[in-house]
Curated annotation (Swiss-Prot):
Stated name of the protein: Endo-polygalacturonase
PbH1 repeats: 178-207, 208-229, 230-250, 259-280, 288-310, 322-343
This protein's record includes keyword Transcription: no
Glycosylation sites noted in the Swiss-Prot or TrEMBL record: N361
């Protein structure tokens, strides 16, 4: 049965009551004593540190200026619920945070609020127990797998810093309905899932504005970055390995189908299926505009160095592009590197694309003979 931590006993209130009372009798129930020992509340700082006692109710979490989660074991089927925090709250992860196994959709962690800071202390890890879920099917069948970290409705000047995610069952960060959010120094290590992990997107962005992701180090089995909608999105200084590259889309078929003012720069994509990718949905409506890829280095790419296409249907290309999601004002500047001999250097399939700036030097693979609808100055 799926539980939400906010429905459990409020140990914070219980801890405050006990601190004002005489010392507990030696015969006190061990579970209660352990729980009380796990909660320390001083001057608005709330610490949860007993591995056997996951983050409790926190019905009183709104009174915590700082929440420290130290070596906590979150029960199976449970969301570590850090939503609705008071403005300016600082959340710190210490030690290893673990999550029990259960087939469910998640998320494992959810955070929301205004001017929220989430920090991973030195040596801390959030371990998603992915090996128990990976079956080669991802979200397309098999076991039901929980998504990892919802960064939804984070507003103001919120940030997530130096957090290390290990072994995510599927998608890692879902960034949705957020504004002014910065993620820096994030490490995502799903390398243990290289044979059976699937749909382990690192950063999925939707319906968000003014988002910056800097210094990410990602090893996964799907998109390193996937921007499905949003404006003012920056990804810089990232290293992506093992996945599907730096992607816009697929765009179309959702409630929000506009991507604009995106900068993806100073990043490396290696040992991945694709390097740079923009894809829109067949027959859908929306727009992609003002997207810049700058100073992108590719190596060990196995499918496409650069792929931009307007023909996606049910997650797969059809070879027949449609014009309902025009791709305009795209700049590829100093996108360079190598692909494998069986891969394709560049593939562009457009029905409505215009106003592109093209500075691409990708070598080592095949030259596509199926490119179509190329904007002026673009070469396959």
């Amino acid at each position: 049965m799926v539980h939400i931590l906010s429905s459990a006993l409020s140990l914070l209130r219980l801890g405050a009551a006990v601190s004002a009372a005489p010392a507990p009798a030696p015969t006190a129930a061990p579970n209660v004593a352990d729980a009380l020992a796990a909660v320390e509340k001083r001057a608005g700082s709330c610490t949860f540190s007993d591995p056997a006692v996951p983050l409790p109710a926190i019905k009183s979490k709104a009174s915590c200026a700082t929440i420290v989660i130290s070596a906590v074991a979150v029960p199976s089927g449970t969301t570590l619920d850090l939503t609705g925090l008071k403005s300016g709250t600082h959340v710190v992860f210490e030690g290893t945070t673990t999550f029990g196994y259960e087939e469910w959709s998640g998320p494992l962690v959810s955070v929301s609020g205004t001017d929220i800071t989430v920090t991973g202390a030195s040596g801390s890890v959030l371990d998603g127990n992915g090996a128990k879920y990976w079956d080669g099917k991802g979200t397309n069948g098999g076991k039901t797998k929980p998504k990892f970290f919802y960064a939804h409705s984070l507003k103001g000047k919120s940030s997530i810093n130096n957090v290390k995610i290990l072994n995510s069952p599927v998608q890692v960060f879902s960034i949705n309905s957020a504004s002014g959010l910065t993620l820096s120094g994030i490490t995502i290590d799903n390398s243990a899932g290289n044979s059976l992990g699937h749909n382990t997107d690192a950063f999925d962005v939707g319906s968000s504005t003014d988002i910056t992701i800097s210094g990410a180090n990602v090893q996964n089995q799907d998109d390193c970055l996937a921007i499905n909608s949003g404006t003012g999105i920056t990804f810089t200084g990232g290293t992506c390995s093992g996945g599907h590259g730096l992607s816009i889309g697929s765009v179309g078929g959702r409630s929000d189908n506009v991507v604009s003012d995106v900068i993806i720069e100073s990043s490396t994509v290696k040992n991945s299926a694709n390097g740079v990718r923009i894809k829109t949905v067949l027959g859908a409506t929306g727009s992609v505009s003002g997207v810049t890829y700058k100073d992108i280095t590719l190596s060990g790419i196995t499918s496409y160095g650069v792929v931009i296409e307007q023909d996606y249907e049910n997650g797969s290309p059809t070879g027949k592009p449609t014009s309902g999601v025009p791709i305009t004002g795209v700049t590829l500047s100093n996108v360079h590197g190598t692909v494998s001999s069986s891969a394709t250097n560049v593939y562009v399939l457009c029905a409505k694309c215009s106003g592109w700036t093209w500075d691409v030097n990708v070598t080592g693979g095949k030259t596509s003979t199926k490119c179509a609808g190329l904007p002026s100055g673009v070469k396959c």
